[in-house]
């Protein structure tokens, strides 16, 4: 998270939140107002504590819901037109990196960097939400608060990860805590101008509240740029491994431990790939190779700023882990997502050696996230994605082992299909004809593009174009996707998706070369202000924010075919909201 660089540079950020370290961490509020902006959210009451509830308990009286800051939310709160309907967003405040993704006891926990009282990155906490299907989320109380030191100076819980200490290697749990509930959070204790150190917290109530370890920090190398620990279990070495960023030294350090408390350095993977200003939010996983019984290790590194499109991006390396070192297969830099708005991706921890590799990314960019024109919240997460590896053609002579991403469980949200067409070509009356979408509703589209090469093919004209217009009366706002067969290029244009709001770094249009070795499949998830595009069954992905004028949402989609290009097997399907209030 770029905030870390700002704070480490000594720039003071003003926060509205006073010390919360002494306050109980599981509280209800006394009442709620009609919420129009973040400052109207009712303060948390210090007078009434609530015992840890069972799963599915966060519906408050009179049809309201519980927010991420323990506030009651009025019915219809999540229906605001500037809020995505199927992507997780905080009830209020500012959210960035996903943290501590862990699956245990049939429940997916997702923690996240959270500034609950401001709409810009500030006094970071660990927010918390849970799901049984990676689609529908319930808000839980804040898991980790800042620590207050002398003279009111705060140290902040920066990004990290979570594990299930099934065998109680840490000794933090009693026999009364069942193994599946022994969740340990590993995070960076960021003390501005002093140090970044790794610390842990643990739960004794199944993951509802957390207590900081009294012996923190568990790893301190006397550095101001040492953060974002990802801890995994090495099944071959039978020990814990921490992957942590030595951010401005461009290093990813590996440490081992048998108890999550005492750590020994193993190696450093350094100065590889795209550098940017700094490394952040590393991760590593053993990923299956499609069509085989083989696995390869993948090392993820976020960089910011310094992305090819500017700002934030996540790169990865394919290789092997020998228990001490990560050894890449090649020096090729690969990017997880080629859009403008994907950063700080995190992977789910599971106690199973052969569990699916599942991850989530922060759908924003530090170049403009603090100015995004949303009213009571800022930022969203991508839908959960399953990762595999596949040999993907790069040109007629070379394949490259590449990450394949598949969105998970979106099918649970599908409504009745709105539109189907077996083919749309340039001579079809359907080419360019608008399809009206339900108001304030997410939707998906699925299409295969093909080209008749017997016809002339000219760059800029031999293409298929998908246009998503807003529902404002004049259709002045839109976002579009072009597949140009002559140029072997995919173009995303969001120049008309920032009306009423302007940021010079909000790249209006960008193109990416794609090697077209046959038909091109496109699967898109379009939510209020967010597009996730998956090309050729996840060989490439593009995550992009867009901002229509306040009150406007996607209202039409059209498929325009030019010069020998055809859209085949076209479907458009609305998606039901994930929220019940």
UniProtKB/Swiss-Prot annotation:
InterPro entries: ConA-like_dom_sf (IPR013320), Glyco_hydro_32 (IPR001362), Glyco_hydro_32_AS (IPR018053), Glyco_hydro_32_C (IPR013189), Glyco_hydro_32_N (IPR013148), Glyco_hydro_beta-prop_sf (IPR023296)
CDD domains named in the record: GH32_Inu-like
GO CC terms in record: cytoplasm; extracellular region
Amino acids binding substrate: 94-97, 113, 158-159, 227-228, 280, 366
Catalytic activity: Hydrolysis of terminal non-reducing beta-D-fructofuranoside residues in beta-D-fructofuranosides
Annotated keywords: Glycoprotein, Glycosidase, Hydrolase, Signal
Glycosylation sites: 37, 40, 46, 57, 62, 79, 168, 175, 322, 399, 409, 425, 446, 452, 519, 569
Coiled coil residues, start to end: none
One Pfam family per UniProt: Glyco_hydro_32C
Major enzyme class: hydrolase
One GO process term, biological-process aspect: sucrose catabolic process
GO MF, one example: sucrose alpha-glucosidase activity
Known EC number: 3.2.1.26
Family: Belongs to the glycosyl hydrolase 32 family.
Protein name, entry field: Invertase
Protein species of origin: Schizosaccharomyces pombe (strain 972 / ATCC 24843)
Protein's gene: inv1
């Amino acid at each position: 998270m770029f905030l870390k660089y700002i704070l480490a540079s000594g720039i003071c950020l003003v926060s509205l939140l006073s010390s919360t370290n002494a306050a109980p961490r599981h509280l209800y509020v006394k009442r709620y107002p009609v919420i129009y902006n973040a400052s109207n959210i009712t303060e948390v009451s210090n007078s009434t504590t609530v015992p840890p509830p069972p799963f599915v308990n966060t519906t408050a009286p009179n049809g309201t819901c519980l927010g991420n800051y323990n506030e009651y939310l009025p019915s219809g709160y999540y229906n605001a037109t500037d809020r995505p309907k199927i992507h997780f967003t905080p009830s209020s405040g500012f959210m960035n990196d996903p943290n501590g993704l862990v699956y245990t006891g049939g429940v997916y926990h997702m923690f996240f960097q959270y500034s609950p009282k401001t709409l810009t990155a500030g006094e970071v906490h660990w927010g918390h939400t849970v799901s049984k299907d990676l689609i529908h989320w319930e808000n839980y109380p804040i898991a980790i608060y800042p620590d207050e030191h002398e003279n009111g100076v705060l140290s902040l819980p920066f990004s990290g990860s979570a594990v299930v200490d099934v065998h109680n290697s840490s000794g933090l749990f009693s026999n009364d805590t069942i193994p599946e509930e022994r969740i340990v959070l590993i995070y960076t204790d960021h003390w501005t101008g002093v140090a970044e150190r790794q610390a842990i917290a643990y739960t004794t109530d199944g993951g509802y509240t957390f207590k900081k370890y009294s012996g923190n920090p568990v790893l301190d190398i006397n550095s101001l740029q040492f953060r974002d620990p990802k801890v995994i279990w090495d099944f071959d070495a039978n020990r814990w491994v921490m992957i942590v960023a030595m951010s401005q030294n461009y290093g990813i350090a590996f440490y081992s431990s048998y108890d999550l408390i005492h750590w020994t350095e193993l190696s450093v993977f350094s100065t590889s790939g795209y550098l940017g200003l700094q490394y952040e939010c590393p991760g590593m996983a053993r990923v299956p190779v499609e069509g085989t019984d083989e696995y390869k290790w993948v090392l993820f590194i976020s960089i910011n700023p310094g992305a090819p499109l500017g700002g934030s991006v996540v790169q990865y390396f394919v290789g092997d882990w020998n228990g001490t070192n990560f050894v890449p297969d090649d020096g090729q830099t690969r990017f997880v997502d080629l859009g403008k708005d994907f950063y700080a991706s995190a992977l789910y921890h599971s106690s199973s050696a052969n569990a699916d590799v599942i991850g989530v990314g922060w759908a924003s960019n530090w170049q403009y996230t603090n100015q995004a024109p949303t009213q009571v919240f800022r930022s969203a997460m991508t839908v959960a994605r399953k990762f595999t590896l596949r040999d993907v053609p790069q040109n007629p002579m070379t394949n490259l082992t590449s990450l394949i991403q598949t969105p998970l469980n979106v099918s649970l949200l599908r409504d009745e299909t709105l539109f189907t067409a077996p083919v749309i070509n340039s001579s079809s009356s359907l080419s360019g004809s608008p399809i009206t979408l339900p108001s304030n509703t997410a939707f998906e589209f699925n299409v295969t593009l093909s080209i008749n090469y017997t016809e002339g093919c000219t760059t800029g004209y031999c293409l298929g174009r998908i246009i998503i217009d807003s529902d404002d009366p004049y259709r002045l706002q839109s976002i579009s996707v072009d597949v140009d067969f002559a140029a072997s290029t995919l173009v995303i244009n969001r120049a008309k998706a920032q009306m009423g709001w302007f940021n010079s770094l909000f790249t209006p249009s960008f193109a990416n070369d794609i090697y077209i070795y046959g038909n091109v499949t496109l699967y898109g998830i379009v939510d209020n202000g967010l597009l996730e595009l998956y090309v050729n069954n996840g060989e490439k992905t593009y995550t992009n924010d867009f901002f229509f004028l306040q009150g406007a949402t996607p209202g039409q989609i059209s498929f325009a075919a030019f010069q020998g290009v055809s859209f085949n097997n076209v479907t458009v399907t609305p998606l039901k909201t994930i929220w019940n209030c």
